[in-house]
Amino acid sequence: MAARRIAQSSINWSALAERVPANQKSSFGAFKTKSDIYVRAVLANPECPPQIDWANYKKLVPVAGLVDSFQKQYEALKVPYPQDKVSSQVDAEIKASQSEIDAYKKASEQRIQNYQKEIAHLKSLLPYDQMTMEDYRDAFPDSALDPLNKPTFWPHTPEEQVGYKSKEQLEAEAQGHH
């Protein structure tokens, strides 16, 4: 009977353990141990308290009305089971994270399609070991070295080129400071 009380909150520990990162395994083990201790403590007690034989106590206790008073107080005592206030928040977070997951999946599928297009384009090109400088310039005009149309100075880094402006300079110009 006691297992029925906590059956709804049972956790699939093996599935959860697969998702725990390696650096958090010790914390996960400690959490599982504490949970197991709690479950054992709950299961050690019966769901309902044992029935009290009030008639027997009425025979044994000499003070009249004392057992009746205790019986009324005992039967009037109701220990409230705490309300679950967190499950609705968890469900809301699950729904929110599910929408984020769906958006991430859509974006990932789009990225995969773009990467597959890039792969198809790269496969359609001449192999790099067979390319000349002109072939490379035709295939990748943005990254190819073009000394005739866009000459650069050694060491060919953006910082060393004529007209280069740092991020700070560009931000200052955007704000109107010269």
From Swiss-Prot:
Function per UniProt? Mitochondrial membrane ATP synthase (F(1)F(0) ATP synthase or Complex V) produces ATP from ADP in the presence of a proton gradient across the membrane which is generated by electron transport complexes of the respiratory chain. F-type ATPases consist of two structural domains, F(1) - containing the extramembraneous catalytic core, and F(0) - containing the membrane proton channel, linked together by a central stalk and a peripheral stalk. During catalysis, ATP synthesis in the catalytic domain of F(1) is coupled via a rotary mechanism of the central stalk subunits to proton translocation.
**Stated family:** Belongs to the ATPase d subunit family.
Q: Where does this chain mainly localize?
A: mitochondrion
Tell me which Pfam families the record gives: Mt_ATP-synt_D
Gene Ontology annotations for the cellular component aspect, listed alphabetically: mitochondrial inner membrane; mitochondrion; proton-transporting ATP synthase complex
* Entries under PANTHER family matching the protein: ATP SYNTHASE SUBUNIT D, MITOCHONDRIAL
Gene3D superfamilies from the UniProt entry: 6.10.280.70
Protein name listed in UniProt = ATP synthase subunit d, mitochondrial
Indicate yes or no for the key word Transport. Answer: yes
Originating species: Drosophila melanogaster
| Complex formation | F-type ATPases have 2 components, CF(1) - the catalytic core - and CF(0) - the membrane proton channel. CF(0) seems to have nine subunits: a, b, c, d, e, f, g, F6 and 8 (or A6L).
Listed A to Z, the keywords are: CF(0), Hydrogen ion transport, Ion transport, Membrane, Mitochondrion, Mitochondrion inner membrane, Transport
Indicate, by first and last residue, each region the UniProt record lists as having compositional bias (Basic and acidic residues).
Answer: 165-178
Top-level taxon:
Eukaryota
Entries under SUPFAM superfamilies matching the protein: ATP synthase D chain-like
